[in-house]
Amino acid sequence: MCIRDRSDLVAWRQHVFSSVNKAYLPLVPLIQRNEGPGSSTNSYAYRGYHETAWIINRFAHVARKHGLGDVCISSLTKIYTLPNIEIQEAFLKLREQARCHYHKPHELSQGLNVINNTNLMFFAAAQKAEFFSLKGMFLNKLGMSEEANQAFATAIQMDLNLPKSWTEWGRYNDGLFREKPTSMHLAANAISCYLQAAGLYKNAKARKILVRVLWLLNCDDAQGTLWQACDNYSGETPIWYWITFIPQLIQLLSHRQSKFARKLLMQIAKSFPQSLYYYLRTSKEDFALMKRSSLAASQRAARAQNKDAPADAPKNDEADKDPANPHRFPADHVEEILNILKTAFPLLALTMENIAEQLQQRFKPSNDEDIYRLTN
């Protein structure tokens, strides 16, 4: 729907609620006399104005999404003409106004003034936290990094369960890491914030954050700073949204982040085995081939080393091996996860294996088809 059609729809709805207001407003004095001025019933008489404020905020939101900042601001100013609005609508109005200024570099100071001049006393904790998150975003864009970090920390202190605050704090640290690629603690902080936000979102917004986590893990150093940040996370894990990244997690089994990937794949195997079984089945064959090649190369290198060594040199091949921390190949991790899946869901694993075997048999080309393929 284009913005012109939405404008016509808004005008029609405002006309409808204007008629509702004309019918209800004469009843306000009667309600105040019967039940007192502080009665909750009194607010029902202004329900038409509340709906009008909601309409204005929604239209301003759509206008901002269309890149029409002037239309958004002019629409929001109409809220001040209403005699009565709810706290939630006042919050949405101020948030839309600040976001509209945020996307215009020459209006950043104006948007920051909107936030600083807002009286937060009447707002809930989550709304106050979102205001401080917006303040941190403006300060960060204005180049005041320390003040932005303090604003994000204040937002988290006000509401630990607001995913938007965690997301923006993670983006703040992520941006600093892009400017200073050697500062791994910034990337670790970003990963911690992203994982916390993904666990709180409970919707598809978590996927965009998890993509960023996987990208940051590829920038890990030799000490494993980033995967340790993942390992130290003890909050809720959105297993359903990690399903999308099963191929990436399986590939991580062959890197330093194998411990983190193994833990996630085990949780997926216990909760959603059908989404994982065929990936494991295919990866098992690939990783087994890699394991055989690696072991063969190690044996050839060991034989060459023993051949070049003096005859009287002591053989201490086992001295370099640490029995407490044996090296594990990706194939070992896949085998372990597959065994857990088969143990937890034996009938399901058997059924899916039968399906795979039937597919191989049914789609296997006949001898005539092989001859035709080879000769043409």
Model-based region annotation:
Residues 93, 131, 165, 206-209:
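TPR alpha-solenoid repeat register
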Residues 58, 94-98, 133-134, 168, ...:
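"A position-specific structural signal for the A-helix of alpha-solenoid helical repeats
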